[in-house]
Curated annotation (Swiss-Prot):
Function: One of the primary rRNA binding proteins, it binds directly near the 3'-end of the 23S rRNA, where it nucleates assembly of the 50S subunit.
Lineage: Bacteria, Bacillati, Cyanobacteriota, Cyanophyceae, Synechococcales
Protein name, UniProt field: Large ribosomal subunit protein uL3
Domain of life: Bacteria
Biased composition (Low complexity): 142-153
Record has DNA repair as a keyword: no
Disulfide bonds: none
GO annotation, biological process: translation
Disordered: annotated span: 129-162
Gene Ontology MF terms in the entry: rRNA binding; structural constituent of ribosome
Keyword list, A-Z: Ribonucleoprotein, Ribosomal protein, RNA-binding, rRNA-binding
GO CC term (a single one): cytosolic large ribosomal subunit
Length: 217
């Protein structure tokens, strides 16, 4: 099973298939990442691979983090991520994880922080229908009733209301890998990916119940 990789979203573009149809794609600079730690059952209670991505300035790294990162290489890394594995014997501290771990035609799950849209109303945040815009109506973009009076006499927790929209960690599943450029560390996937250009994303094999992760389907 292939472990995941960290990368940076570059933006969106389009490719054309054999029939001339435009296919929307997202370009991701995936890795290279460095293995910074191997976790084992004996020491940690579980087996996992920790990788790092993105060079950081020394002033932004604490002394404990600096000591931890220098064990695997000379560069100080900004982003760390763990992936559970069954065995760590095939990895060594300092190994490079690149886009070669993935294949064209493979499906992946990509996680990232969605674009923040600030405080938004009911229509924009939840897709509510608006009220009449004329004929004396004063209920244009108002929410309508939020709860009854005597019973229950309150608004239930989780009621969809206006509030901060976006800026949350979300995952888009089952994205198809269309192209890989290992010279430029580029991964081209079909469809959109969470976040804005320049944001960090986590790419891992598609997790399908009943199948091993990363299998072609």
């Amino acid at each position: 099973m292939s472990i995941g990789i960290l990368g940076k979203k570059l933006g969106m573009s389009q490719l054309f298939d054999d029939k001339g149809n435009a296919v929307p794609v997202t370009l991701i600079e995936a890795g290279p990442c460095r293995v910074t730690q191997l976790k084992t059952n004996a020491l940690d209670g579980y087996t996992a691979i920790q990788i790092g991505y993105g060079v950081s300035k020394e002033k932004h790294i604490s002394k404990p983090e600096k000591g931890h990162l220098l064990k695997s290489g000379e560069e100080l890394l900004k982003h760390l991520k763990e992936y559970r594995v069954e065995e760590t014997s095939s990895y060594e501290i300092g190994n490079q994880i690149t886009v070669k771990n993935f294949e064209v035609g493979q499906k992946v799950d990509i996680s990232g922080k969605s674009m923040g849209r600030g405080f938004s109303g009911y229509q924009k945040r939840h897709g509510f229908s608006r009220g009449p815009m004329s004929h004396g109506s004063k209920n244009h973009r108002a929410p309508g009733s939020t709860g009854a009076g005597t019973t229950p006499g309150r608004i239930y927790p989780g009621k969809r209301m206006a509030g901060r929209y976006g800026g949350k960690q979300i995952t888009t599943k089952g994205l198809l890998v269309l192209k890989i450029d290992d010279q430029k560390n580029l991964l081209v996937v079909k469809g959109s990916v969470p976040g804005k250009p320049g944001s960090i994303v986590n790419i891992k094999p598609n997790n399908v119940v009943g199948k091993k992760g990363g299998e072609k389907s």
